[in-house]
Amino acid sequence: MTREKSGISRREFLRQGTAAGLGLAVSPSLAGLSWAATKDVVKILHGTGMDSLHPYNHSSGSLYGAWEHVIEPLAYMDYNRNEFVGRLAESWEFQGKKWVFHLRKGVKFSDGSPLTSKDVAFSMNFMKTDKRSLQKSPFKRVVEIQTPDDHTVVILTKKPRVTFLVNSIRNRFIMSKAAIEKNGTDFGKHPPIGTGPYKVVSFQRDGDWVIRRNEDYWGAKPQVKEYIWRKVGEEAARVAGLEAGQGDIINYIPVHEIPRLERHPRVRVEKVPGLRIYFFGLNPVFKPWDNKLVRQAANYSVDAHSIVKNIFDGNGFVLDGPVGPHVIGYDPNMKRYPYDPKKAKELLARAGYKNGLDVKLYFSPGHYAKDTEVCQVVAS
């Protein structure tokens, strides 16, 4: 398949707006379309709803992806290239305790006003100080934000921070300073004004969130004119809605439904790499996990590859460490413990548990896909 000529392809919208899913299903109305053609209006049945139009009053990965089409960051993480790419900033420099961002010229907000460095400084200070903001912590170490000219932003930090782009730039969206000063912060009445390829048309709490194409977008014009984001919490209801034509796209497909939907003649399933990680926390403060040998035995006793193959039908992959390849800090040289129950028993015996031991396994049933089945396998 070829990529759309528009600035944001349909696949990229799905990737950003439905992060961490096991898969996506596209309805009959979209399945036969090429990348050069699409519907004017696309309905997304999503497991997560938009409960507020406050752009900083959330910390959800999927909502970050949705908002990015209305209000944009200085830079974003391109997971295909595994590197940061400029969006509102065309370049930047790291100078110890100073970060200098050079804004892209000619960028306008959806109301026609130009983007300047003052909008960037205002938005970041708003994230840092607004009482409803859930994005304050990334700016705790920011000392000052300077705007020497309309297209330059200088951010001073207490100490050098190599993770600054990850924590304080990625997913930190820029709003219009003038619009906030004019309309106030009742975003339910006056939605945020951004520079993105779409603008907010309407919103219902935990209902429909409608965004429409910004015809004056500074970048390449996307081909889809309007997206309707509808919350459908139940997995089965999303699948039924897709097959009934009530939606064009669904996310978080139940694992057991993937093979059936893949065989469906009028549905296309797209699998995208997710960031959801299944792990078991072994607290080394409490017994028996304070013993390194017991922790090692636990790692040797779980056949992770079998879990992916038999429970998730191959829809996943086994990690060698605590983070995946798309996360800062990933070490490709780290190797996981192999499945070796004999080794696990030997380690337990050395730790003083020759006959094994009983431990409690806590989890929240239904919170993650197939979580009960995974825990049953681990417990056995």
Over which residues does each language-model region extend?
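N-terminal secretory signal peptides
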Residues: 1-12, 35
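N-terminal lobe/hinge region of extracytoplasmic solute-binding protein
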Residues: 45-96, 125, 193-195
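A structural "hinge/loop" feature
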Residues: 48-64, 87-88, 113, 135, ...
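Gly/Pro-rich hinge or "lid" segments in bacterial periplasmic/extracellular proteins
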Residues: 78-83, 169-222, 226, 236, ...
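Aromatic- and charge-enriched surface segment that lines or borders ligand/interaction sites
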Residues: 90-133, 148, 154, 238-241, ...
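Surface-exposed binding/hinge segments that line
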Residues: 93, 98, 137-179
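Ligand-site clamp/hinge motif
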Residues: 100, 214-260, 379
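Append "and occasionally in soluble cytosolic enzymes with long acidic Gly/Pro-rich linkers
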Residues: 213, 290-380
